[in-house]
């Protein structure tokens, strides 16, 4: 177990942010900067396991993965080799989410082998189903939830199901999406072991005549799950990141991985998985993060850098609870409605009308600002450049935030966590394509 330490942010100069001293009378301010315990870990997973060797899982761990969905590509479910694979991964610092496939037409006792992992410290939970329909949720998944509570009673093993995205047809879903989420929330409310999860895979970066487009339904899906997560007090909001080109999704670069991470975090996501980690057995899938032997590709190093950034900020970001998202239409965006609202934002249902402690925000590109609060009541903001990173320098975003009262800002950006002085309650962030920052404004008494 990590020793609990306190993360203290020191004053530092920087070139990405506007800096200077700001006068203040100190009324209602803090006597010292907020500090955050170093006892948290961002859950970063991989889909499609590498070969079950020490070397392969060492490579996964060094990329920054903390867990993997352990399928049966190299070791059959319930076999001694599967158990050895989980132990080998654990020795390298990679936990396991057990996999049942979809368990179609199979009774719960077909999975009694999983109960043997009840006390295994290398297992974080069990994945029972990928994309169930409403009837499947209302029957099979409810039965699995009861079985899980009984088999894993008194343990930290989580119950996990990955949900359909909003674009699935009603013929497939067999019900409305609102009904779908409501049914799932009822199931999760009855979970008695581990942490509660809500998960979705929505891959937003698509091929287009211009080279790339961002799916217009992505944010709507994220906000729906974020609302259910908040209303139902679900612990873990998990999302898959597109890392392998397939179907009508485009090739992915480092900026695209970072972009997906920051947009997801604007909606409070606190666990992410790369789809896929290893080269898929499906030959239509492009290069993944590692090849079939588990050897790194160029994309591996892209993901490794993004993971370093996520882990650098985890103790700050994970100390906050999500409250909502405020959208800012970029001044350079020409695709707006009659009210000047971005095409990506105008159909959102639950966006905030304002940010607490913020007078106004301007941005050159479409920008998402997720609002958060820590245990002491301090506000935190994920500021995510929403412009498609495919277009490089054209997608650079300058964001200016006018706070009501702030003379310092703790800023997580890249692998840095630093505190900056703020001029006249105003902070300017220069975000490159795909970038974001986590900002904690502070009114510090002098």
Predicted regions and their residues:
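N-terminal secretory signal peptides that target proteins for export/translocation
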Residues: 1-2
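C-terminal motif of bacterial Sec signal peptides marking the signal peptidase cleavage site
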Residues: 18-21
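Glycan-processing catalytic domains of CAZymes
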Residues: 26-407, 412-446
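Sec-dependent N-terminal signal peptides
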Residues: 5-14
